[in-house]
Swiss-Prot record:
GO terms classed as biological process: translation
Organism: Aliarcobacter butzleri (strain RM4018)
Record-linked InterPro entries: KOW, Rib_uL2_dom2, Ribosomal_uL24, Ribosomal_uL24_CS, Ribosomal_uL24_KOW, Translation_prot_SH3-like_sf
Subunit: Part of the 50S ribosomal subunit.
Source superkingdom: Bacteria
Protein name from the UniProt record: Large ribosomal subunit protein uL24
One Pfam assignment: ribosomal_L24
UniProtKB keywords: Ribonucleoprotein, Ribosomal protein, RNA-binding, rRNA-binding
GO molecular function ontology, one term from the record: structural constituent of ribosome
A Gene Ontology cellular-component term: ribonucleoprotein complex
Function as written in the Swiss-Prot or TrEMBL entry: One of two assembly initiator proteins, it binds directly to the 5'-end of the 23S rRNA, where it nucleates assembly of the 50S subunit.
PANTHER family attached to this UniProt entry: MITOCHONDRIAL RIBOSOMAL PROTEIN L24 (PTHR12903)
Family to which this protein belongs: Belongs to the universal ribosomal protein uL24 family.
Length: 79
């Protein structure tokens, strides 16, 4: 069963641990079953994309935000 989280989509949070410590950003998605959040422009990874006739005929790399554990973020109050 998923727990109730105090951080919601659209909230501003600060990263308090990890490689992006000190950065602030907006929550794009909350994953309550995994206890993780996705924060805009934080923990960005390069993903390889295969060539596709419709979406991306050339293929290449795409920057994608990866989930961060809920314990590594703190909600910024007053914004």
């Amino acid at each position: 069963m998923a727990i109730k989280l105090k951080i919601k989509k659209g909230d501003t949070v600060k990263i308090i641990a990890g490689d992006d410590k000190g950065k602030t950003g907006e929550v794009l998605a909350v994953l309550p079953k995994e206890k993780k959040v996705i924060v805009k422009d934080c923990k960005v990874a390069k993903k390889t994309v295969k060539p596709d006739q419709e979406k991306n005929p050339e293929g290449g790399f795409v920057n994608k935000e990866m989930p961060i554990d809920i314990s590594n973020v703190a909600k910024v109050e007053g914004e």
